[in-house]
Amino acid sequence: MTNIRKTHPLIKIINHSFIDLPTPSNISSWWNFGSLLGLCLIIQIMTGLFLSMHYTSDTTTAFSSVTHICRDVNYGWLIRYLHANGASMFFICLFLHVGRGMYYGSYTFMETWNIGVLLLFTIMATAFMGYVLPWGQMSFWGATVITNLLSAIPYIGTTLVEWIWGGFSVDKATLTRFFAFHFILPFIITALVIVHLLFLHETGSNNPTGLNSDADKIPFHPYYTIKDLLGVFILILSLMTLVLFFPDLLGDPDNYTPANPLNTPPHIKPEWYFLFAYAILRSIPNKLGGVLALILSILILALLPFLHTSKQRSLIFRPITQTLYWMLVANLLVLTWIGGQPVEHPFIIIGQLASISYFSIILILMPISGIIEDKLLKWSL
């Protein structure tokens, strides 16, 4: 009798993707984040679905409906905080996943990498629109400030902003369309994830050495299913600790005040996972320049395959670029800190220096160090 797992048209696809998938035998725990991101996406879609059953996308009732979810709906508080903190976990896993890709040279899989960059943009857009929905002070002013950036686009800017708003300010029409987009985008993300995996399985996974591992492959199940399960337990433990003990740790207290267009909060800032990009945006005095720098801070990832100058794929045997990589990580942490600070001395200059070094490390220093390391390797032989 033939095995249904290997013959059934549908089950066969799942089998080749998660069970009999040939996987390098030496991939470390840094390769766990793909499955953790899948889990985060499932958690977000499920909690979001239940929240949408009780939420109303109307400016007069949105804030009250969120309060109603927390107070009156069975385990509504749990669903709400799982969704809010689940987004933070999603971004932690995302940043680690992208960081792993940069360190081990996974960006040489061009199609997989570019779909990944597109996914990052889509997830960021989804998270931004989700932050607007509770209709607190930071929701309203965050939406106003960020959408207003589009007015920097020459000629069509103002028209574009009013078109997105559905009026002359952020109001009922804006909230309704943001809710519609926030609901549909996770399903588009799911489709993109499938394409991301499709391209990945065309080439097979990268590994810490960056070398071809065709000669040493093992089946994904049971080896990596068990390994991924450890990551799943750690993720769930971290998320539940956050939700049950510190649910508001990563949120903004201003968002517990209903949106008021007549009262501007003293410091308008986005969620913590956007602070690095927000710091880059603020570090440029010109509005259009700031917007371009903001977009480029993420889009720069798509340039990585073209900036790769070394003969080696991974950074595992490249000490100079390794040092630059960790400088970049530290730099991003500084940018995240600066993004949450008020626009005053010394934070302005620190933000500008950190922004310059962010682009310098990726665009100039890393490609140069790749060439230097190749030369050193040639001389040492």
Curated annotation (Swiss-Prot):
Keywords: Electron transport, Heme, Iron, Membrane, Metal-binding, Mitochondrion, Mitochondrion inner membrane, Respiratory chain, Transmembrane, Transmembrane helix, Transport, Ubiquinone. It holds the Pfam family Cytochrome_B. A ubiquinone binds at residue 201. Its cofactor is heme b. Heme b b562 binds at residues 83, 182. GO terms for cellular component: mitochondrial inner membrane; respiratory chain complex III. GO terms for biological process: mitochondrial electron transport, ubiquinol to cytochrome c. One of its GO terms (molecular function) is ubiquinol-cytochrome-c reductase activity. InterPro entries: Cyt_b/b6_C, Cyt_b/b6_C_sf, Cyt_b/b6_N, Cytb/b6-like_sf, Cytochrome_b, Cytochrome_b_C_euk/bac, Cytochrome_b_N_euk/bac, Di-haem_cyt_TM. Its main location: mitochondrion. Binds 2 heme b groups non-covalently. It comes from the Eukaryota. The chain crosses the membrane at residues 33-53, 77-98, 113-133, 178-198, 226-246, 288-308, 320-340, 347-367. Component of the ubiquinol-cytochrome c reductase complex (complex III or cytochrome b-c1 complex) that is part of the mitochondrial respiratory chain. The b-c1 complex mediates electron transfer from ubiquinol to cytochrome c. Contributes to the generation of a proton gradient across the mitochondrial membrane that is then used for ATP synthesis. PANTHER family: CYTOCHROME B. The cytochrome bc1 complex contains 11 subunits: 3 respiratory subunits (MT-CYB, CYC1 and UQCRFS1), 2 core proteins (UQCRC1 and UQCRC2) and 6 low-molecular weight proteins (UQCRH/QCR6, UQCRB/QCR7, UQCRQ/QCR8, UQCR10/QCR9, UQCR11/QCR10 and a cleavage product of UQCRFS1). This cytochrome bc1 complex then forms a dimer. This is Cytochrome b. It comes from Archboldomys luzonensis (Mount Isarog shrew mouse). The gene is MT-CYB.
